[in-house]
């Protein structure tokens, strides 16, 4: 656990936090870890006020933090801080979308979709943080369990099939409190 919030410093902005996150990413790559993609957190506006976060954030997903499984899977929670579990829709991209991509462009870049569970963590006790803290904390990512993938082309004819592929009954909703997740593009 951290003993102090980075955001307690008045000059610690989201830009500063993302710069720190990129510096940590470079150190992890230098020691042999491989980024697999990104997770997007706080996609549910309904929880923003609770966590003092007012926009989605992103963090890197690493080869050492992801487990792919076709059935049952096991994740170790050693060395995590105050872990929580969140259901996720995990997206694999065959190409990195352009920065100004349209929804159609994003769908064209998509390769597969899979159900998943993310273990999120907070290094700040009690999950008390501001947006820059979550970015500095790797987007709160700890582990990701990715279930069986459905090819994107199998899903294009019927949008309801996306929900079925993710294990949700059509019209059944989803993870209302989930922080969001994603993988791909590395």
Please name every model-derived segment.
Residues 1-183:
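Catalytic-core "active-site belt" of small-molecule-metabolizing enzymes
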Residues 186:
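Glycine-rich phosphate/ribose-binding loops and adjacent secondary-structure elements
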């Amino acid at each position: 656990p951290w003993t102090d919030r980075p955001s307690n410093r008045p000059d610690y902005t989201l830009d500063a936090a993302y710069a720190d996150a990129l510096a940590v990413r470079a150190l992890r790559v230098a020691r042999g870890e491989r980024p697999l993609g990104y997770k997007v957190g706080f996609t549910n506006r309904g929880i923003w006020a609770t966590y003092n976060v007012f926009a989605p954030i992103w963090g890197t997903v690493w080869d050492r933090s992801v487990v792919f499984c076709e059935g049952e899977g096991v994740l170790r929670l050693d060395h995590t801080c105050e872990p929580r579990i969140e259901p996720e829709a995990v997206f694999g991209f065959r190409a990195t979308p352009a920065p100004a991509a349209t929804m159609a462009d994003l769908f064209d870049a998509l390769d597969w979709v899979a159900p998943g569970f993310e273990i999120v963590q907070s290094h700040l006790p009690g999950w008390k943080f501001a947006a820059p803290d979550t970015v500095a904390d790797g987007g709160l990512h700890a582990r990701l369990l990715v279930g069986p993938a459905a090819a994107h082309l199998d899903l294009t004819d019927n949008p309801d099939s996306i929900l079925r592929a993710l294990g949700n009954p059509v019209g059944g909703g989803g993870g209302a409190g989930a922080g969001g997740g994603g993988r791909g593009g590395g």
